[in-house]
Amino acid sequence: MQKILNCHYLEGDSLHPQSNVDKMAAGHPLDDDDRWPWLRLIRNHLTEQAKEVYDLDVTSSNRAVVVTCSSLKKVYRDILREVPAELGTVIFVYLKGTHELLLQRIQGRVGHFMPPSMLQSQLDTLEEPDEKQEKTIIASIIPLPDVEAKIIVEDAVKRGYLPSTCL
């Protein structure tokens, strides 16, 4: 999506404190107390990026900010939504896949600190977002990432989340 929109991008995992990285690398799932400071860091970064692009033309795709992270619970997404309304609206994209496909993707990551054995703990924590209650696009991870990103952007434009100039 970042390539299509030519916008700011942050991989949320890059903001994990070392204690979280060490805990996950050892195969121990994070708990809420581990996640709160990390989620606030992501939200703060998102807010700062939104301030940087605020003065761009409202029809510019460059005005978007893309952040990837595992906001598994609604309360986690609520923290990320705390970007001031005048700076923009936080939209979530929930990438949905089978256990097998998710495991395959995790096993294919090179140099990531979270071992594949932790997938089940992530799925156990997951509260799937409701498109009717949260500004969320639910997308399949079956297509190749570049294909799925294009589908997501098209859906976001169709729903009015992004300007038509993003296509």
Residue ranges and their predicted role:
Residues 1-4, 79-84, 155:
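Alpha-helical structural signal in soluble globular domains
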Residues 2-47:
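Conserved substrate/cofactor phosphate-moiety recognition/catalytic segment
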Residues 4, 88, 104-107, 127-167:
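NTP-dependent small-molecule kinase module
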Residues 12, 68-69, 93-95, 139-141:
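Small/polar loops that bind or transfer phosphate-bearing groups
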Residues 15-16, 71-73, 97-101, 144:
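Conserved nucleotide-binding/hydrolysis micro-motifs of P-loop NTPases
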Residues 23, 28, 83-129:
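A glycine- and Lys/Arg-enriched "phosphate-lid" helix/loop adjacent to the NTP-binding pocket
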Residues 33-87, 95:
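Glycine-rich phosphate-binding loop used to anchor ATP phosphates in small-molecule kinases
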Residues 60-67, 77, 102-103, 107, ...:
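Non-catalytic structural scaffold of enzyme domains
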